[in-house]
Amino acid sequence: YKDIMISNRIDKLKRNCKYSGDIMDLLDSIEDGNYVTEFINSFTTNKTHFFREDFHFVDLRDRVLPNFANSGTKINMYCSASSTGEEPYSMAMTVLETMELLGKTINASIIATDIDTNVLQYAANGIYRFSKSSKEFPSWIRPQKYFKRRIQKNLSGEEVLIKVNDELKKMITFHVMNLSDNS
C-alpha cells in the first residue's frame, strides 16, 4: 500500500512541477531549494470533515465558551493542520450557535494554519462538495444558517456544493505554517 501511495505522490509531484526528467534529479533540485512548496503539497495527507471528533465541539460549547459570554474578553482560538478548513469552520459555527443558545455575545477569532498552500486556498474559498455520504452535522447545528446550497452540473451529472457564509469567513484567518519549523 505505501509503495503505491509514494509512487502516486511522486507522479503528482512531477505533474505539479511540470517535470518530465528523472526523479533523482527532481529530488536534488528540491534539496537545492526548488519546488519545495510543490513537494510539500504533493506529500501532505489531508483528512478532515465538519465536526470531526465532535466531542471537542460539545466541550467548547458547554464548558469553554460560556466563560467568555458577555465578558468583554476576546477568545483567540487556534486550529493547527486545518487542511481544507472544515474544522475551523466548525469552531466558528460552534461559537455562533453558543452565542444564540446563551443569548450573549462572545468575541472570538480563529487562526487556522496548514503547511499545504493548496488546501489553505480551498479553505479560504469555503466551497465544499456535499453528498448523502457526507458526514452529517450534529443535531445542534443548523447548516442552512451557515451555508448556501447550489447545484453544479458536471460530466457525471449534478453535484451539490455548499458555500460558507461571510459571517463564518470573517471569524477565521488562514495562514501557512510548518509546525515542525523551529524558527
Regions found by a protein language model. Name each.
Residues 1-78:
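Conserved AdoMet
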Residues 46-50, 84, 182:
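Short strand->helix junction
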Residues 50-63, 89, 166-180:
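N-terminal "domain-start" segment that seeds a small globular fold
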Residues 64, 68, 95-99, 127:
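Active-site catalytic pocket residues across diverse enzymes, especially alpha/beta-hydrolases
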Residues 72-90, 109-111:
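Conserved class I S-adenosyl-L-methionine
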Residues 84-103:
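Conserved SAM-binding loop of SAM-dependent methyltransferases across substrates and taxa
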Residues 101, 106-183:
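Extended basic-aromatic, gly/pro-enriched interface segments that bind polyanionic ligands
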